[in-house]
Amino acid sequence: MSAAQSTLSTNAGPAVGTPPPQVLLSARGLTKRFGGLAASQDVSLDLWRGRIHAVIGPNGAGKSTLTNLLSGDLPPTAGTVTLAGQEVTGRAPHQISRMGLGRSYQKTNIFLPLTVQENVRLASQSRELHRPWNPLHWIDLATHNEALQARCDRAISLAGLEDRRHIVAGTCSHGEQRQLEIAMTLATQPQVLLLDEPLAGMGVAEAERMVELLLRLKPEHAIMLVEHDMDAVFTLADHLTVMVNGQVIASGTPE
């Protein structure tokens, strides 16, 4: 073990007397090469339900590349990704999303002219598969719409945006827009959340609200957090991975 690695405890096991959390996503030997450049080199990690796994490192370390490899936005040169026991390596992002993975991006991805509720409802609809024709489709449609609205309402509530649901997204504050993006992700009912710098550009009060939101989401999800705000990282992280030049140089509990 290197000197850098020795600064992090590797005792990441569950507390005595509590059931071990479930591994929801595993990556083994993930490598991504662009010509002669290795943006990600032999990266392995596990994401557990009920834990927040933070990935830190300088700009260009490979953190966003890793996130894109896990979500399917980039195909790996080598290595495998397993989600909820099924290998998803090489699958399209929309397929991986429907299997239970949601993500946010460094740049907020929302529909600015639409209301908060309309944004979340669109995200909720995106997880739906095409259904065969049904002669009783009006009854089926009513049931379907109720379920869709229930997912939408729950996502808005979890994200703390109940009193903003009818506000046009473009008029929301930066922090609220980041909360909205997470609400849209939650509307797809993911088990695993990949969050790429969710606190970027936030003031103190907005950052505190985001930390509270992530702590609310933690018990039911496996979360990977890419973040430069070290105060937030050490408040939230159960496990910490440090990347430099596409490689993991340290991984363990932040003690």
Regions found by a protein language model. Give the residues of each.
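Glycine-rich phosphate-binding loops of nucleotide-dependent enzymes
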Residues: 2-255
